[in-house]
Amino acid sequence: MRLSLKSPFVAALACLVSWSAAAQGTQREEIVRIPAAGGAMMVATVLRPPGEGKRPLAIINHGSPVDSAQRLKMERPHYPSLSSWFIARGYVVVLPERRGYGETGGAWAEDYGSCRSPDYFGAGLQGAADIKATIDHMRGQAYVAPDRTIVIGQSAGGWATVALSSLNPPAVPGMINFAGGRGGHQKLSGGGMGNCEPDALVKAAGRYGSTARVPMLWLYAENDSFFEPKLARRMVDAYDAAGGSATLKALGPFGSDGHNMAGSSSGVPMWSGPVAEFLTSLK
């Protein structure tokens, strides 16, 4: 099959190649420790674009393994394509590993309790506290511009990002939630697998929205096995109805599970347009 240079597939492939090239041999990587609540020290990866001077900050926040035994075995998060996309646009990218995960270790701060009565609201705020600690620490670095930070999160990290929006941290003009939520892929008391208590997610989203004033972009794929489109719509409707300002982009299916879109290079053509448009809209 011959592909025209005007083909959308070829154009998307060209973009992917340029993002990969931008990341190779030019970005600088450093592992740092960031003070967090309770005396914890979070391990974080810092990726810097070439050149000197102060750059805007992008914080990318990871998800959580379904199997609790895997939390402390987690490798440091990478999100290479997502990171490269922001680095190519001049951002310093930071990927913190929150309390209770991987090399950071310690007690799991985001424990939401039992599946029958989950505290998704409190769990999200614990994750938000770690993101806020990352913002505060990184803004003190000589190479970071303290007046512009974009917060991005996927799955549990997306949920923590939604929670952070309720705190309205200064100089954060926008936040991006990829497939955010908690309690997915759990064994249900009535049998089968699913979300522990979807109504609790919707209620917590509304509570966050009641104080949130920072613009948000929510991205969910059609075949997300953790948080299906109807649930995503219910959450964003509750968030906005309570006073929040979120735009939901319901994207098409991605691979075998749309929940993995943010972590795959193949997902870039799906989300890059909405993300670029969102960033352009911010003051």
Describe each PLM feature range.
Residues 143-154:
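Alpha/beta-hydrolase fold nucleophile elbow
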Residues 158-169:
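Short glycine-enriched nucleophile-adjacent loop
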Residues 53-55, 64-105, 228:
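Short substrate-entry loop that stabilizes the transition state in hydrolases
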Residues 113-142:
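Alpha/beta-hydrolase active-site loop
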Residues 24-53:
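N-terminal cap/lid segment of alpha/beta-hydrolase-fold proteins
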Residues 174, 180-242:
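The feature captures the conserved acid-bearing segment of alpha/beta-hydrolase catalytic domains
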Residues 233, 242-283:
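C-terminal catalytic histidine-bearing segment of alpha/beta-hydrolase fold enzymes
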Residues 61-63, 220:
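The conserved beta1-alpha1 loop
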